[in-house]
């Protein structure tokens, strides 16, 4: 049964209806429509915590989608799933692939920074201070890029940069 037929969530149902209308109205090839349908189903499954199903849909959307900008969002969402499952190396790979296609994706930059920060905290707890410092510096660089793209977001990151003395090159 297609995902849109079993949605109980009002927001998901609304999104599905709107997405179907957009697909009917906008000129798109059959392949583009099919790619978007898989992407939509992936987002719906992801929002319900059905990560395996979401990944299947995203991979199929990725296979069909040719537009680099649209592919960047598919890759970003795949990264989100891997990060949610604690598979940070894979998440980083997908976030970087998304950025290769769309360098104006502050959420991917932020999520990379969050992973490096988390790894820095873990290294600190293990008293691996040089590694922790390196990871925190990497987090700082990615947060600075995200903040440059979206200066009104990432307030906590801005505060962290200031309190850790890493905001010296932050120009918004």
Curated annotation (Swiss-Prot):
Signal peptide: none annotated. One of its GO terms (cellular component) is chloroplast thylakoid membrane. Gene3D superfamilies: Tetratricopeptide repeat domain. GO terms for biological process: photosynthesis. The keyword Hydrolase does not apply. InterPro entries: PSI_Ycf3_assembly, TPR-like_helical_dom_sf, TPR_rpt, Ycf3/AcsC/BcsC/TPR_MFPF. Pfam families: TPR_1. It is a peripheral membrane protein. Keywords: Chloroplast, Membrane, Photosynthesis, Plastid, Repeat, Thylakoid, TPR repeat. The keyword Membrane applies. TPR repeats lie at residues 35-68, 72-105, 120-153. It is found in: Plastid, Chloroplast thylakoid membrane. Belongs to the Ycf3 family. PANTHER family: CELLULOSE SYNTHASE OPERON PROTEIN C, TPR REPEAT-CONTAINING PROTEIN MJ0263. Essential for the assembly of the photosystem I (PSI) complex. May act as a chaperone-like factor to guide the assembly of the PSI subunits. HAMAP family: Ycf3. This is Photosystem I assembly protein Ycf3. It comes from Guillardia theta. The gene is ycf3.
């Amino acid at each position: 049964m297609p995902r849109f037929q079993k949605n109980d969530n009002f927001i998901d149902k609304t999104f599905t209806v709107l997405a179907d209308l957009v697909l009917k109205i906008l000129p798109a090839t059959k392949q583009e429509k099919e790619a978007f349908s898989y992407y939509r189903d992936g987002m719906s499954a992801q929002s319900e915590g059905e990560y395996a199903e979401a990944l299947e849909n995203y991979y199929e959307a990725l296979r069909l989608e040719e537009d680099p900008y649209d592919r960047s969002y598919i890759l970003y969402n795949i990264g989100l799933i891997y990060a949610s499952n604690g598979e940070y190396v894979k998440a980083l790979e997908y976030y970087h692939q998304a950025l290769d296609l769309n360098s104006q994706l502050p959420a991917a930059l932020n999520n990379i920074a969050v992973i490096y920060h988390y790894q820095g905290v873990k290294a600190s707890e293990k008293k691996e201070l040089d590694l922790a410092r390196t990871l925190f510096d990497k987090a700082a660089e990615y947060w600075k890029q995200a903040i440059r793209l979206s200066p009104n977001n990432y307030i906590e990151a801005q505060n962290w940069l200031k309190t850790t003395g890493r905001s010296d090159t932050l120009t918004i």
